[in-house]
Amino acid sequence: MKMGLLVLFSLTLYGVGNDLVAPDFSEGLQGAKLEKKDERGDQVVFHFKTGLSSKKFSAILKKNLGPAWRAQKLKQEDMIFAARRGRSAGAGVNLTVYQHPADKGIRIRVIHLKSKSGTNHRAEVAVIKGD
């Protein structure tokens, strides 16, 4: 009985049984200006302009997502996509992918593009469903 209650309680903490709502960054993020929003098939991509370093941007994004979201092992297709974005933008790239344990069907792919010529960095936050 105690074990059953413990399992039920732990599942409730992660939101199992509730439909996880995909994050929406339409309002922007602290220290980053939303430039545009693209919707392509199963994903919504938010494009930001920021003066924040990759580390600071990631900290703000993680705080916005909440403590249950976890960084995931990178998939090869994400790494290839990020490398191409970096090459086309002439920028250094930092890639992180987050996933919520309650819903493995939603991933957040974050690409931070560090400009080689200054402090005008860009970030792309893609909310990917059904991956």
Question: Predicted segment positions?
Answer:
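Sec-dependent N-terminal signal peptides
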Residues: 3-12
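An acidic-aromatic pocket/loop used at catalytic or ligand-binding sites
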Residues: 14-131
